[in-house]
Amino acid sequence: MLILTRRVGETLMVGDEVSVTVLGVKGNQVRIGVNAPKDIAVHREEIYQRIQHERAMQSQMQHLEQGNFPTSFDDDDFFNR
């Protein structure tokens, strides 16, 4: 992890197209602004995790709708017991 110190009004660059600017500090909260191209998604971590969880759930539902049921055993072994 790269650790940087920035003051209010200072900016850091992520690659050539994304800039992050410190807009203000109040107590233990830091206000930042992010400039990025529209094709680059920018989310708070908790929102990103929720999106990832929802995508995983949608993927599982699609597999179930298509009849792709995950199994942890071999069907032949199960029925020949």
Curated annotation (Swiss-Prot):
Question: Whose protein is this, by species?
Answer: Psychrobacter sp. (strain PRwf-1)
Q: Which domain of life is it from?
A: Bacteria
Principal place where this protein is found?
A: cytoplasm
How does this polypeptide assemble, per the annotation? Homodimer; the beta-strands of each monomer intercalate to form a hydrophobic core, while the alpha-helices form wings that extend away from the core.
Alphabetical list of InterPro entries matching this protein: CsrA, CsrA_sf
Q: Where in the cell is it found?
A: Cytoplasm
Disordered: annotated segments: 59-81
GO MF term set: mRNA 5'-UTR binding
Cellular component aspect of the GO annotation: cytosol
A Gene Ontology biological process noted in the UniProt record is: regulation of carbohydrate metabolic process
Q: Could you read off the lineage of the organism from its UniProt record?
A: Bacteria, Pseudomonadati, Pseudomonadota, Gammaproteobacteria, Moraxellales
Asked if the Swiss-Prot or TrEMBL record annotates the protein with the keyword Repressor, the reply is yes
- Describe the task this protein carries out: A key translational regulator that binds mRNA to regulate translation initiation and/or mRNA stability. Mediates global changes in gene expression, shifting from rapid growth to stress survival by linking envelope stress, the stringent response and the catabolite repression systems. Usually binds in the 5'-UTR; binding at or near the Shine-Dalgarno sequence prevents ribosome-binding, repressing translation, binding elsewhere in the 5'-UTR can activate translation and/or stabilize the mRNA. Its function is antagonized by small RNA(s).
- Which key words are in the record? Activator, Cytoplasm, Repressor, RNA-binding, Translation regulation
The protein's name in its UniProt record: Translational regulator CsrA
- Pfam families from the xrefs? CsrA
- Identify the gene encoding this protein: csrA
Biased-composition ranges for Polar residues?
59-71
Family classification: Belongs to the CsrA/RsmA family.
